[in-house]
Amino acid sequence: MARHWRAGAVGMAVLGLTLTACGGAKVGDDSAGGSGSSGKCGTFNLAVNPWVGYEADAAVVAYVAEHDLGCKVTKKDLKEEIAWQGFGTGEVDAVIENWGHDDLKKKYITDQKTAAEAGQTGNKGLIGWYVPPWLAKAHPDITDWNNLDKYASKFKTSESGGKGQLLDGDPSYVTNDEALVKNLKLDFKVVYAGSETALIQAFRNAEKNKEWVIGYFYEPQWFMSEVPLVKVKLPEYKAGCDADAEKVACDYPVYNLDKIVSAKFAKSGSPAYDLVKNFTWTNDDQNTVAKYIAVDKMSPEAAAKKWVEANRGKVDAWIK
């Protein structure tokens, strides 16, 4: 889900890795290990970024690491840049769903050499502006950004200062939306819902009650199977059109989501590293596990167990 660090928040974390993303474990806290012995795997420190798709990735990787490889897995709930800082301290071994972040790759892989790439996850990531299905059906032209100002007054809220509201999610997700609104000269204001859960609920209510909502959203996302949001066409993305964050006036690219590990972990010989490197699945796979967690209210471990037992062939290919 849109996953870039907002520039203004980075400074909060530069003095240490004690902040958390979702009220989860602080770095340094241990979660329970698996049923297997730690064996040659030892401790595997896995960052968990604050969206349910990532939580699904982490649940499955942690389950396999614990139950098949005998690792002691420590999950650490962290926002993105904070997790990358942990590569250099040894407090984070892996980030298993990275959305682009060329800036962080340059800083931590190229310059500091504390991190390394570990291949793609197999997931294709989309970010954009979406409206509920009822709205796209009632006003088909609303899915073209050129027509948004015509409807701006319909999207006004008490928080949007007389303009149309463009709803974003977790404030830690870096989006291009404020720059897009400005550079496309739209009569809208970006307002943050506060979390992925709040964003989903806003779209769910909008579809149920025929409310006017337009907002930032992303795929893969299990919620799309419940409410198939319709993407608004923004000016076409072309390589380099988003190079200057303040001048962005184009759509988001398609992201080939990938995995990042600490340089030390990559050279450790740990079977957990091989698991991370070999881990790959589809958007449908992720959405299935995410739905178990978010909708069916299963624990991450129970959700992972259910998926692993139904997809043993895929799992065996990761640990062969």
Where are each of the predicted segments found?
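Short helix-initiation/N-cap motifs at beta->coil->alpha
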Residues: 49-52, 72-86, 191-202
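A bilobed periplasmic-binding-protein/Venus flytrap-type ligand-binding module shared by bacterial periplasmic
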Residues: 127-137, 255-268, 291-292
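C-terminal motif of bacterial Sec signal peptides marking the signal peptidase cleavage site
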Residues: 18-21
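A conserved helix-loop-strand patch within extracytoplasmic ligand-binding domains
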Residues: 113-166
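Ligand-binding pocket segment of bilobal, Venus flytrap-like solute-binding proteins
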Residues: 86, 92-99, 165-241
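Short, well-ordered beta-strand elements
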Residues: 39-53, 71-76, 163-167, 276
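An extracytoplasmic/periplasmic, membrane-proximal ligand-sensing/linker region
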Residues: 53, 173-189, 193-210, 271, ...
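Bacterial signal peptide processing site
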Residues: 23-26
